[in-house]
Amino acid sequence: MGISRDALHKHRLTGAARKCNYKKRKYELGRQAAKTKICSQGEEKRVRSIRVRGGHQKFRALRLDTGNFSWATEKITRKCRILNVVYNATSNDLVRTNTLVKGSIVQIDATPYKQWYETHYGVVVGKKKSAKKDGEAEQVVKKSASLLAKLASRAKGRVLDSAIESQIGEGRFFARITSRPGQVGKCDGYILEAKELEFYQRRLQKKKSAK
């Protein structure tokens, strides 16, 4: 038995070394960190199951490429690709090595959310207005009266933050991981919005300017 979570090997408050009066116990064992990484090109996700105390199962994710991320203001969740880790309050090494842990700030693919938004509200977002070329005609999609009425009712309550819209244009969202990939084998979280997004954007800007 290697890693142990006991206090027997710790020094006393006085600085004296404790005398070990019993051997390591099974219930005090520790395991190595999963250090979940993002899958490289063409690599499959890797999740291992571990039998733990009480006969339960833990799922140790070693390689992941996707996760379920929720968009709170729109009350939707979509499975999307994780692109890279951009910030971690604990350690810069976890950012450098693209390690997925709870609380990490990652960039995710915005395409699934963009597709849903455009279908749900019937508007085009994140696209720069460009001059039409000669002979280029707009595609007209026929919509039923009931669908137009539905889209009109949805448009009344439609509010899209400018920061979110610019991210949709870039094709990337900032998101926070809320699950524990090394324990549950999944990388789930939520999209950053409003003041929380502003806070992390400031932190990232500060980090860039310090280089």
Swiss-Prot record:
Keyword Transcription regulation assigned to the entry: answer is no
Top-level taxon of the source organism: Eukaryota
* Annotated InterPro entries: Ribosomal_eS8, Ribosomal_protein_eS8_euk, Ribosomal_Se8/biogenesis_NSA2
The answer to whether the entry has keyword Cytoplasm is: no
* GO biological process entries: maturation of SSU-rRNA from tricistronic rRNA transcript (SSU-rRNA, 5.8S rRNA, LSU-rRNA); translation
Q: Which keywords does this chain's UniProt record carry?
A: Ribonucleoprotein, Ribosomal protein
Segments crossing the lipid bilayer: none
Q: Which Pfam families match?
A: Ribosomal_S8e
Cellular component (GO) terms are: cytosolic small ribosomal subunit; extracellular matrix
Query: Single GO molecular-function term?
Result: structural constituent of ribosome
PANTHER family membership: 40S RIBOSOMAL PROTEIN S8
Hey, which family's this protein in? Belongs to the eukaryotic ribosomal protein eS8 family.
Q: What is this protein called?
A: Small ribosomal subunit protein eS8
Q: What is the lineage of its organism?
A: Eukaryota, Amoebozoa, Evosea, Eumycetozoa, Dictyostelia
